[in-house]
Amino acid sequence: MAPSQLPPIFNPTPQDIEMLLAAQCHLGSKNLQVHMEPYLWKTRPDGVNVINIGKTWEKILLAARIIAAIENPADICVISARPYGQRAVLKFASHTGATAIAGRFTPGNFTNYITRSFKEPRLIIVTDPRTDAQAIKEASYVNIPVIALCDTDSPTEFVDVAIPTNNKGRHAIGLIWWLLAREVLRLRGTLATRETEWDVVVDLYFYRDPEAEENKEIADEAKVPGAEEIGAGAVESGFAGENWDTQAPGAGVPGTAFSAATAAPTSWEADGGDWAASSAAPAGESWAETQPAEAKW
């Protein structure tokens, strides 16, 4: 890391440097574009170009100052056709108030005023100059400044501010957008001091594969054992080992009244009496006397 020309207050913390290295923001490609040579630190024996992350940090601060100088945040357009950067630009837009274009860039967005999606931004920020070439080309037609995340092999034509970084890894892209958003909020005063921690974690800016998330949920559901896995015999033995009649009778336990009633079977011949005798009318008593008097309406 080269000596920084920034004031001491803007120097990165050790945690920031560790995050940049852990996300592999310093690993470029094996090709080198001539305009990206000033940001090169060294070339590894395997041919991979290593980016100077000190220059990366300086360009993040420069880009944040440009973004914070625009009064209306909606006049800033953040673009990413690369899938790894689409979640990051949407999160950046939600935290800073910018306008996000995630996915395919419709030709004519900046030049054809007849289209419904026509926009007139004051600044655009792109994730990759190669995949977002259409947006950069149209911005050059209407004099819109361009900030871009550039790898060592990225074309820098019509790019005004290049942030040297690895723009192909999902962690590197998400981290750069997160650092840029945090720095913009610091300059705007949303974060009181530079020592104030931002409560938004960097993981929210990382790309997540929908299919992988769905497969993970299916795998978690498959971990719950069913009757097919533990066997029908184990289920039956589990039920057989329990005594269902040992529960104390209680009002709140369903089935206790039924268990008590069926515990001792009733013998219908226990009395040994005559059913006809029990249903016969008492001696000296007439049916007419026992019938109730008719009501008179």
From Swiss-Prot:
Where in or outside the cell it occurs: the entry states: Cytoplasm
Gene3D superfamilies named among the record's database cross-references = Glucose-6-phosphate isomerase like protein, domain 1
List where Low complexity composition bias occurs: 256-289
Q: Which CDD domains match?
A: RPS2 (cd01425)
Q: Which Pfam family, any one, appears in the UniProt record?
A: 40S_SA_C
Coarse class of the protein's main subcellular location: cytoplasm
InterPro entries (UniProt xref): Ribosomal_uS2 (IPR001865), Ribosomal_uS2_C (IPR032281), Ribosomal_uS2_CS (IPR018130), Ribosomal_uS2_euk (IPR027498), Ribosomal_uS2_euk/arc (IPR005707), Ribosomal_uS2_flav_dom_sf (IPR023591)
Biological process, per Gene Ontology = cytoplasmic translation; ribosomal small subunit assembly
Can you list the GO cellular component terms from the UniProt entry? Answer: cytosolic small ribosomal subunit
Alphabetized PROSITE patterns for the sequence:
RIBOSOMAL_S2_2
Q: Where is this region: Disordered?
A: 252-297
Q: Which UniProt keywords apply?
A: Cytoplasm, Ribonucleoprotein, Ribosomal protein
Q: Which GO terms describe its molecular function?
A: structural constituent of ribosome
The task this protein performs is described as: Required for the assembly and/or stability of the 40S ribosomal subunit. Required for the processing of the 20S rRNA-precursor to mature 18S rRNA in a late step of the maturation of 40S ribosomal subunits.
Protein family (similarity comment):
Belongs to the universal ribosomal protein uS2 family.
Quaternary assembly: Component of the small ribosomal subunit. Mature ribosomes consist of a small (40S) and a large (60S) subunit. The 40S subunit contains about 33 different proteins and 1 molecule of RNA (18S). The 60S subunit contains about 49 different proteins and 3 molecules of RNA (25S, 5.8S and 5S). Interacts with rps21.
Q: Tell me the protein's name.
A: Small ribosomal subunit protein uS2
